């Protein structure tokens, strides 16, 4: 689901602040 993807991207962003995702 979109929410699940959002949470996954948020976790990755917390691990790698350099990488930013935009939906």
Swiss-Prot record:
Organism: Vipera renardi
Family: Belongs to the phospholipase A2 family. Group II subfamily.
Protein name per its UniProtKB record: Basic phospholipase A2 homolog Vur-S49 analog
Keyword Cytoplasm among record annotations: no
Cellular component aspect of the GO annotation: extracellular region
MF terms (GO), sorted A to Z: toxin activity
Keyword Flavoprotein: no
Location(s), subcellular: Secreted
Record key words, sorted: Disulfide bond, Secreted, Toxin
Summary of the tissues where the protein is detected: Expressed by the venom gland.
Post-translational modification: Contains 7 disulfide bonds.
Residue ranges, annotated region (Disordered): 1-23
Highest taxon, organism lineage: Eukaryota
Major place of residence: secreted
Regions crossing the membrane: none
């Amino acid at each position: 689901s979109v929410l699940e993807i959002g949470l996954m991207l948020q976790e990755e962003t917390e691990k790698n602040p350099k990488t930013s995702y935009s939906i």
